């Protein structure tokens, strides 16, 4: 595990990189998800799921404002690692300072520089393996960092540049050798995150149709696989970040059941944690706290996500952009007026949508699978009565599709402008909740001041972490810009050498 720094303020962002391999635990390298926890001896304070590609991934965790000052344990593991005892999971200590409130839980010892010299913390000296092009920079000025080519064979090289305004003594915990766990066996998450949910009830039928759908402009719908009495697993793939999900469980006779999602985290609480020994200046922490409050008030940059229109690897046979047509009040009116290749039949008191079979030149005997923002609705009458002004696209997927034990004669997918099923009433057998999927390599945002107009902008830039690169493999240098926060900055390059030893080199520069 690698973090951007060792000491944080409550409310700051923590950037963490996780790497797994097969050396210690054969088979662990197949994992596509890692779990990160930040705990004290009382409770879990923050958690995150990390998406892994080729055994590596990273995440950004916002530390809660309520965290007390003290030392915390940061631990990481995969689902497959739960076959071994928890004391073998990688762990490290991090320091957190809460400058806005004092708590009885605070475990903080403020030291002077003499105590730190005795404790083994010394000032960083010039390192020929990592050098900046200058020793002193101005505000919003370009910085060039270079390092020796001797590290070209190193693995998992990570670079961070942070303001040096707080020194802490951080003793690292010892990790035990892996010992097998007795009991339940845990399979690796080879394709993606496995969501586990339990059906609530005393007398459950032997067979239930359980589904998990992600609300959005893409189709992410999964059928639950029964693993034990009332316990179902949903094997997701490619779903990342926070999503609104819809869970449903229904018996063959139509009876609805409630489901609860089970936490995938172990909740590794340490028995003891050392007190936090810290050296800092009040003025530096006040400036850092003000910078944190400004950063939280500023809107964050969000990169647009490319939408995937394929369903089961198939592109839409026909797409209707409703913004290009005369607006009607209901979806049924749109279907009748201009959507071709579909028909509306009646089955008792319910309306059923069927799609055209091109090979047979007739409408399919099986009903269509109707989706609204990725969520399946089996009562087609409700969809047909939906406000068409909310809908942007209607996608048709012709052919035959199987979902669990059910067959469908095509898919009709309605995508709304907002992608969140606005004003759509969910059925009694559905539950909607927010769920955090693994983070997919979040981007560290930093401004570039090469343009004089941007450099002269009055928009504040109080970045405490100037630069964070979870992977600088194959590079021999980077460029970035300083912020409006003056002080001493420390660059740290970390990694693993070819023979498996830890690499860590540092250098310092001033910003005035």
Please annotate each region the language model reported.
Residues 3, 40, 216, 372-373:
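Structural motif
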Residues 19-26, 199:
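Short amphipathic, basic-aromatic surface patches that mediate peripheral association
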Residues 354-397:
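Periplasmic plug
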Residues 35-39, 158-160, 211-213, 369-371, ...:
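Beta-strand signatures of extracellular beta-sandwich domains
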Residues 2, 46, 131, 380-382:
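Short, solvent-exposed loop/turn positions at domain surfaces
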Residues 5-9, 29, 64-69, 78-343, ...:
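Surface-exposed, low-complexity/disordered segments
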Residues 13-15, 51, 57-64, 72:
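Ligand-binding face of N-terminal immunoglobulin V-set domains in extracellular IgSF glycoproteins
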């Amino acid at each position: 595990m690698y973090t951007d720094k060792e000491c944080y303020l409550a409310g700051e962002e923590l950037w963490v990189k996780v790497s797994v391999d097969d050396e210690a635990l054969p088979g662990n390298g197949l994992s596509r998800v890692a779990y990160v926890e930040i705990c004290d001896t009382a409770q879990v304070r923050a958690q995150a799921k990390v998406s892994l590609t080729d055994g590596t991934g990273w995440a950004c965790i916002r530390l809660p404002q309520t965290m007390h000052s003290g030392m915390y344990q940061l631990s990481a593991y995969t689902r497959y690692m739960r076959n071994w005892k928890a004391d073998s999971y990688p762990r490290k200590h991090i320091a957190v300072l809460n400058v806005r409130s004092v708590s009885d839980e605070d475990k903080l010892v403020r030291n002077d520089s003499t105590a730190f010299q005795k404790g083994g913390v010394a000032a960083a000296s010039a390192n020929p393996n990592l050098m900046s092009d200058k020793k002193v920079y101005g505000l919003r000025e370009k910085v060039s960092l270079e390092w020796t080519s001797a590290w070209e064979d190193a693995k998992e090289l990570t670079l961070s540049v942070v303001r040096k305004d707080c020194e802490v003594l951080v003793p690292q915990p010892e990790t035990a050798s892996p010992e097998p766990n007795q009991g339940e066996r845990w399979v690796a998450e080879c394709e993606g995150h496995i969501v586990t949910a339990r059906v609530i009830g005393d007398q459950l039928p032997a067979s239930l149709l359980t589904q998990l759908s992600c609300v959005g402009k893409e189709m992410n719908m999964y059928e639950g696989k029964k693993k034990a009495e009332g316990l179902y697993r949903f094997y997701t793939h490619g779903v990342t970040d926070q999503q609104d999900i819809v869970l449903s469980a229904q018996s063959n006779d139509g009876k609805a059941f409630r489901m609860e999602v089970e936490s995938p985290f172990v909740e590794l609480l340490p028995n003891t944690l050392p007190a936090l020994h810290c050296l800092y200046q009040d003025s530096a922490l006040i400036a850092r706290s003000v910078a944190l409050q400004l950063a939280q008030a500023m809107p964050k940059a969000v990169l647009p996500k490319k939408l995937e229109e394929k369903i089961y690897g198939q592109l839409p046979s026909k797409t209707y952009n409703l913004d290009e047509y005369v607006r009607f009040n209901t979806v049924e009116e749109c279907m009748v007026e201009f959507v071709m290749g579909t028909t509306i039949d009646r089955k008792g008191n319910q309306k059923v949508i069927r799609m055209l079979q091109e090979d047979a030149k007739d409408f399919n005997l099986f009903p269509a699978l109707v989706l609204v923002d990725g969520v399946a609705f089996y009562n087609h009458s409700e969809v047909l009565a939906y406000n068409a002004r909310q809908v942007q696209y209607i996608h048709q997927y012709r052919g035959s599709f199987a979902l669990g034990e059910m067959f469908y004669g095509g898919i009709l997918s309605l995508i709304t402008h907002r992608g969140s099923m606005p004003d759509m009433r969910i059925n009694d057998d559905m539950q909607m909740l927010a769920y955090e999927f693994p983070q997919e390599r979040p981007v560290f945002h930093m401004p570039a001041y090469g343009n004089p107009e941007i450099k002269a902008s009055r928009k504040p830039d109080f970045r405490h972490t100037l630069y964070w690169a979870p992977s600088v493999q194959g590079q021999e240098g980077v460029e970035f810009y300083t912020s409006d926060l003056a002080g001493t900055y420390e660059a740290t390059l970390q990694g693993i050498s070819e023979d498996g030893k830890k690499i860590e080199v540092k250098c310092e520069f001033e910003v005035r």
